[in-house]
């Protein structure tokens, strides 16, 4: 378990985890990925708190700093995956052409727009979270829920897209029980994130459900999942949860 958690940090962050202490990327590492989300969320929550202290409550700059820390801590690979996935979904042609577009490396109009929307929405939503403990929990919930969505994308029965090295190693590795346990845990964690005790859990479940539909569409369009699809699942879910938690 320690090796899987270390592998999850090596895969999902810029932390210099010694390779000898990590498990090979696969089922165990992906199962531990939401644990990485808890730590990343706590770091982002601390930055949000410090920014709110420096710039005033509900400062958009504080929210932007929290998002920037997440991007730096993950090498921007998830937001890049979102951009590539949106570009792939936005092109015409066979799955092979869509996969070529995704592997091109440059961001098209759709991809660039998706980055702006995701970063902007997360920034504003984080800045609108209540101060104190509830707001910190909200950030942790949003970031962790994104990693739970990655497990949804890797659940049993989901294939890898042709030629996807990462997809081939993680697709279909997560039993439904693992996904449900993590989903229930994050939904429970979300209870104190809002004044209405049902809003947080409902937001988490709805966001993960929406991402499951996105993943299903990606499987139809691309023939399976890729690393980019995992990044898109993480960013979409994080954004939807963050926005859902600040609905009045």
From Swiss-Prot:
Reactions this protein catalyses: alpha-ribazole + adenosylcob(III)inamide-GDP = adenosylcob(III)alamin + GMP + H(+); alpha-ribazole 5'-phosphate + adenosylcob(III)inamide-GDP = adenosylcob(III)alamin 5'-phosphate + GMP + H(+)
GO molecular function: adenosylcobinamide-GDP ribazoletransferase activity; cobalamin 5'-phosphate synthase activity
Pfam families membership: CobS
Single GO cellular component term: plasma membrane
Main localization (coarse): membrane
InterPro entries reported in the protein's UniProt record: CobS
GO biological process: cobalamin biosynthetic process
Functional description taken from the UniProt entry: Joins adenosylcobinamide-GDP and alpha-ribazole to generate adenosylcobalamin (Ado-cobalamin). Also synthesizes adenosylcobalamin 5'-phosphate from adenosylcobinamide-GDP and alpha-ribazole 5'-phosphate.
Protein name stated in the entry: Adenosylcobinamide-GDP ribazoletransferase
Organism annotation: Mycobacterium sp. (strain JLS)
Lineage of origin: Bacteria, Bacillati, Actinomycetota, Actinomycetes, Mycobacteriales
């Amino acid at each position: 378990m320690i090796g899987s958690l270390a592998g999850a940090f090596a895969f999902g962050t810029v932390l210099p985890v010694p390779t000898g202490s990590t498990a090979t990327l696969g089922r165990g590492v992906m199962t531990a990925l939401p644990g990485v989300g808890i730590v990343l969320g706590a770091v982002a929550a601390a930055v949000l708190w410090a920014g709110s202290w420096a710039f005033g409550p509900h400062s958009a700059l504080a929210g932007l700093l929290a998002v920037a820390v997440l991007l730096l801590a993950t090498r921007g690979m998830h937001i890049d995956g979102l951009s590539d996935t949106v570009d792939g979904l936005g092109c015409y042609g066979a799955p092979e052409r869509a996969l070529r577009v995704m592997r091109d490396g440059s961001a098209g109009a759709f991809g660039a727009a998706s980055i702006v929307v995701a970063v902007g929405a997360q920034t504003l939503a984080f800045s609108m979270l209540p101060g104190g403990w509830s707001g910190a929990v909200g950030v942790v919930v949003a970031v962790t829920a994104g990693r739970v969505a990655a497990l949804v994308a890797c659940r049993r029965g989901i294939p890898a897209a042709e030629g996807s090295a990462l997809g081939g190693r993680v697709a279909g590795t997560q039993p439904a029980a693992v996904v449900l346990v993590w989903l229930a845990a994050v939904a429970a964690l979300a209870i104190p994130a809002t004044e209405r005790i049902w809003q947080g859990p409902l937001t988490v479940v709805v966001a993960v459900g929406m991402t499951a539909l996105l993943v299903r569409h990606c499987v139809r369009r691309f023939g399976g999942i890729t690393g980019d699809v995992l990044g898109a699942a993480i960013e979409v879910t994080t954004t939807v949860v963050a926005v859902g938690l600040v609905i009045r």
